[in-house]
């Protein structure tokens, strides 16, 4: 396991966060910024986990399951994207992954010692994780079962793209299409890294917009779950051949 594991996740998070900041920082977005938040949350126990979710759109329209990334809740998808999909004739399923947002939090597991787990992975030893991407993919499919949705377009961003890949690999009959956004099937060969200038711009954008944990929560970001979810990614390994 290379240090690129953390680099990939970190860059994915920064891109995800920058995308969200840009999505909400327009007059149109501000005008409609409460649409998703205003919808009542539903809860269902699926795969032995309580999942918080929302469904927008007509029951007979093709379903789109949106899977968010590392430590992030469903609100980061933003009203503009979601409402454009609804207006285009899709039924949108939004939900919070296990251990983040309003879904069941798994704080009883505590925080992994990341440096130790990464060191173990670096030298080929098995790492410890409280759950895997496959578990999170099963949560997604179980939610579709709960909603009586036989098939859906599966869309994931960052770590959500990894979960979406696992859904497509393990449950191909449930997938109409797969959209994996700013994600990766594993930690092997990579595209060239971003320039220092681009990386600094993303980092500074995040620093400028966020000054404390309460603000992060308002934006739908839950830092407490990130170490456990990073371990889920590392534990799950590579999906390139899948």
Regions found by a protein language model. Give the residues of each.
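N-terminal cap/lid segment of alpha/beta-hydrolase-fold proteins
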Residues: 29-50
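Conserved HGGG/HGGXW glycine-rich cap/lid loop of the alpha/beta-hydrolase fold
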Residues: 46-119
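Conserved alpha/beta-hydrolase "nucleophile elbow" surrounding the catalytic nucleophile
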Residues: 68, 152, 156-158
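Residue in the alpha/beta-hydrolase core beta-strand immediately N-terminal to the catalytic nucleophile
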Residues: 96, 153, 177-179
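Flexible "cap/lid" loop of the alpha/beta hydrolase fold
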Residues: 162-169, 178-207
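Conserved serine/cysteine hydrolase catalytic core
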Residues: 235-242
